A protein has these predicted regions:
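A secondary-structure boundary/capping signal
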Residues: 48, 66, 91-92, 109, ...
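Non-catalytic C-terminal accessory region of glycerolipid acyltransferases
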Residues: 2-22, 121-242
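A transmembrane-helix-recognition feature enriched in membrane-embedded lipid enzymes
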Residues: 2-50, 99-108
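Catalytic core of membrane glycerolipid acyltransferases/transacylases, capturing the structured
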Residues: 55-117
Length: 242
């Protein structure tokens, strides 16, 4: 890959360690700054963080998490980077309408997905990333959940990606990040936040006798259940925080 000739598609389809040297250096510098900033500003803790990864698996894992704020994306991605992993966040293709955002998201490893469609090309990008050992970060809720009464629609498909990549799903949850930017405010508060990882899930955990589609649905449902269980556990431990 080259700085001036690489397309967005090149960034989606190539491994992050194949990016141009200058881009890799810039990526590391930016993430180091964001890691330090987020740790100082939000003082986040990551409980059971080692459960995200399987040291015996050379492939990446599909990480799923509840979504309340863009701040948690920074915390999650920089934490994974600090652990020596590379992560590819899945994001809505609507963000690509703004060229600077499209450029920025592609440079940090993001993979766009057109929701509500059979976006096979993006599924393949994610599959190949997992096979290279890169992790894939997905927020199944599809958008930030800002209030308790906001309707939530789980966007499926992450189990299919895990199946295509022949790998595991790592559920995790966040708490406190929703409180950082109150409704109507443009500035974040310096509040402590929390994250927690749960037990990995694989297709081998599904009950025997299920057909392929049924197995995928079971894995997806179980992963989401674990994700929300972790969220509820964090919220119970930190009353009043979301």
């Amino acid at each position: 890959m080259h700085h001036f000739t690489s397309t967005y598609e090149d960034y989606y389809s190539h491994g992050m360690r194949e990016y141009p040297l200058g881009m890799r250096v810039l990526y590391s510098v930016v993430l180091a700054i964001l890691y330090a900033f987020s740790k100082l500003m939000w003082r986040w803790d990551f409980e059971d963080a080692d459960k995200l990864f399987d040291p015996n698996n050379e492939r990446g894992t599909v990480i799923i998490c509840n979504h309340t704020s863009m701040a948690e994306v920074i915390a999650i991605v920089t934490h994974i980077w600090a652990k020596g992993h590379r992560v590819r966040p899945i994001f809505k293709s609507e963000f690509n309408k703004t060229k600077i955002v499209q450029w920025a998201f592609s440079c940090v490893g993001g993979i766009p997905v057109a929701r509500g469609t059979a976006d096979l090309k993006s599924l393949r990008y994610a599959q190949h990333a997992l096979q290279r050992g890169e992790d894939v970060l997905i927020f199944p809720e599809g958008t930030r959940i800002r209030t308790d009464d906001q309707p939530v629609v789980i966007h499926g498909g992450f189990a299919i990606i895990a199946s295509m990549g022949k790998t595991t799903i790592s559920p995790m949850a966040v708490c406190g990040f929703r409180d950082l930017t109150p409704k109507g405010s443009k500035f974040t508060k310096p509040l402590k936040c929390w994250m927690k990882a749960g037990e990995m899930l694989s297709f081998d955990d599904a009950p025997n006798g299920l057909k392929r589609k049924e197995k995928s649905e079971w894995v997806e449902g179980e992963a989401v259940k674990r994700m929300y269980s972790l969220r509820d556990e964090l919220q119970a431990k930190h009353p009043g925080r979301k």
